[in-house]
């Protein structure tokens, strides 16, 4: 299918052209492009968009307990079966009292968290007070909703402490927003939920909560090929957020599953077998 220019004839002289024939000669020199050979162009766009989607994976989690909010994440970035990085920072500091997590497209998550941080700072300057966790999550949800259906890939948690205490919200790229006491997002979330749900108690100490978060991330990286690297754990309390630990999941494996030393009988049996 070629672009038809037969309807461009006109009796009015055009600025920059001596006559209508000059304009047609100029148009005829412009290269023509084939149009998509499909009757349903909307369907064609959808198929083309699906072809551009890459498999992604991660594990992030957050939960509320009596001491505040515990946030943890792995650090692996992947595209399908290719591991592009083992040191991605998936917990973003929005302000000294609020954190955001990354799951989905790295560029989308980083951009919208930076954007949210700017808007939270402007709110603080204009109103002489910090924005609430609820307000920040609603602001992010509204921004993402305005780009709904345009190919964004964002699954984030907004965790923080404000005048009402700890707050935790989940926000996705469709503008959805959920409030809860514990969430896990990413391809490794089913494995993290298995550990998190079985060990969660509201009245945990900070040490117990950090250990639960670390163990949940480790087990997710052990079973999910798209998660790995370093398990980072943050705590958000009345004084703001603090990074508690960042442990290589390979070393955590031997912490949770120590290798039992061989007994003398086993050593003798192996030597005899050789």
From Swiss-Prot:
Major location (coarse): cytoplasm
Biological processes, Gene Ontology terms: proteolysis involved in protein catabolic process
Keywords: Cytoplasm, Hydrolase, Nucleus, Protease, Proteasome, Threonine protease, Zymogen
Record's catalysed reaction(s): Cleavage of peptide bonds with very broad specificity
CC per GO annotation: cytoplasm; nucleus; proteasome core complex, beta-subunit complex
Entry's localization field: Cytoplasm; Nucleus
InterPro entries referenced in this protein's UniProt entry, alphabetically: Ntn_hydrolases_N, Pept_T1A_subB, Proteasome_bsu_CS, Proteasome_sua/b, Proteasome_suB-type
Family, similarity comment: Belongs to the peptidase T1B family.
Function: The proteasome is a multicatalytic proteinase complex which is characterized by its ability to cleave peptides with Arg, Phe, Tyr, Leu, and Glu adjacent to the leaving group at neutral or slightly basic pH. The proteasome has an ATP-dependent proteolytic activity.
Name this protein carries in UniProt: Proteasome subunit beta type-5-A
Protein source organism: Arabidopsis thaliana (Mouse-ear cress)
Protein's gene: PBE1
């Amino acid at each position: 299918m070629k672009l038809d220019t037969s309807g461009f004839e006109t009796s009015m002289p055009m600025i920059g052209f001596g006559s209508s024939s000059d304009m047609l000669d100029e148009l005829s020199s412009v290269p023509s492009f084939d149009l998509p050979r499909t009757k349903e162009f909307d369907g064609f766009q959808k198929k083309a968009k699906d072809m551009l989607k890459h498999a992604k994976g991660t594990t992030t989690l957050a939960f509320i307990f009596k001491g505040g909010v515990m946030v943890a994440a792995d650090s692996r970035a992947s595209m399908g079966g290719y591991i592009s990085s083992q040191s991605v920072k998936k917990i973003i500091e929005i302000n000294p009292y609020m954190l955001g997590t990354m799951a989905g497209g790295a560029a989308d998550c980083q951009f919208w968290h930076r954007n949210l941080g700017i808007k939270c700072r402007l709110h603080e300057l204009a109103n002489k007070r910090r924005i609430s966790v609820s307000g920040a999550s609603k602001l992010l949800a509204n921004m993402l909703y305005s780009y709904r259906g345009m190919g964004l890939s964002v699954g984030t948690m907004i965790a923080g402490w404000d005048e009402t205490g700890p707050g935790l919200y989940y926000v996705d790229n469709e503008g959805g927003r959920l409030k809860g006491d514990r969430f896990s997002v990413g391809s490794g979330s089913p494995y993290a939920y298995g550990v998190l749900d079985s060990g969660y108690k509201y009245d945990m100490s900070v040490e117990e909560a950090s250990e639960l978060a670390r163990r949940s991330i480790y087990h997710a990286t052990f079973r999910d090929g798209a998660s790995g690297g370093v398990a980072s754990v943050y705590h958000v309390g009345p004084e703001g957020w603090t990074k508690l630990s960042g442990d290589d999941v390979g070393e955590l494996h031997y912490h949770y599953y120590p290798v039992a030393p061989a007994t003398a009988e086993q050593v003798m049996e192996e030597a005899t077998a050789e």
